[in-house]
Amino acid sequence: DRKIRPMLDHPLIEYVGEVDEAQKVVLLKNAKALLNTIDWPEPFGLVMIEALACGTPVIVRGCGSAPEVITHGKTGFICASKLDFIHAIHDVDKLSRKTCREEFERRFSADTMVSNYEELYYRLLQKNSFPEATGSKEAQRSFGLMQLSRASVFR
């Protein structure tokens, strides 16, 4: 609080506090970019994906899932230093908001995610990747249910 509060008095900073989902979408859609400076290995990066869904480029450190979510120079910039962040902020207008949204649709939409999960489950079933059930009749029946065809499981 001692470090952050004084910075909020800057004329270029507007502290909006906690927001609901609708307000978050409005903020992301109207943002020039999402500046995500976390320096821990975030495993998924939902906030980056939410920004892309709004067509907003992301400027981020290259740790955690960032390199998997953001395509450097296309949907944002992956930065290693303060100087990289400065250049990225300066260059963010060169990125296409339409491309950010299209990349979200191609990689992270609900339809895409469902399709990817279906394909993964199908491959696992085809490879018989589950260990053979041994022991009780109930365990053997459960294993048999996992062997269903893709059509009966996913359609």
Label the predicted regions:
Residues 2-26:
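Nucleotide-activated donor-binding/catalytic signature segment of Leloir-type glycosyltransferases, i.e.
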Residues 20-31, 53, 71:
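Short acidic alpha-helix that forms the nucleotide-activated donor recognition element
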Residues 36-47, 67-68:
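Nucleotide-sugar-dependent
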Residues 42-45, 52, 62:
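Short glycine/acidic-rich beta->alpha loop that forms part of the nucleotide-sugar donor binding site
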Residues 57-60:
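Short hydrophobic beta-strand element within catalytic cores of glycosyltransferases
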Residues 62-73, 77-79:
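Short acidic/histidine- and often glycine-rich active-site loop of Leloir-type glycosyltransferases
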Residues 77-99:
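C-terminal "capping" alpha-helix adjacent to the active site of nucleotide-linked donor transferases
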Residues 94-110, 116-119:
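A short, well-ordered alpha-helix in the C-terminal region of glycosyltransferases
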